[in-house]
Amino acid sequence: KNLINKGINLQTNSDTEVLLNYYILYGEDCVSHFDGMWSFAIYDIKNKKLFLSRDRFAEKPMYYYKCEDGFYFGSEVKFIKSLVKESLEINSEKVNKFLSFGARSLFKDNQSFYRNIFLLKNSENLICDINLNLKKKKYWNPNPKINSKINIHEAIEHSTLLLSNTIKLRMRSDVETAFLLSGGIDSGGIVSIAGNTMSKKINTYSI
């Protein structure tokens, strides 16, 4: 709606077209207008630079690798491996941490299981120019404000409203949506709120 109000005539229903037009309008600051999960790359022909971005909570992955012959990126390491000509060295330290501490260790830093293949961090943009110079920028930091003047009932009401609005926003889709139930309180609560606030059929799956 924001783009249409600015006189931009969208040709498709694709998120990609919306994203591209936001970049044309706002440049690198386009991500400050987004709410959700993303991982994308845009090559800016005019300014001769590659722009990579990852969402605020790192829900979508983005790996990158720089060497003498180029800059490589992808949502999975295997894509980079298939393109890089030189042999990649195993990152033994990262492997040992994973074997010792499990999946929690994967997100403690930007290292991958291969040396020099890095993971773009949450809320981070990366610029690669034609000389392969890299520049990273943190575009968002949480700023929790504690209001100790509200009582427990007001806090519950406010939190419920925030959660309901967030779920409603995430359920915007051109196709049917579905929920994966784990059997726990979190997923069950989300489905319950979705069912109460949306006039859509709720499809659920349990594995």
Question: Where in the sequence are the language-model features?
Answer:
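Cysteine-centered catalytic environments shared across enzyme families
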Residues: 1-207
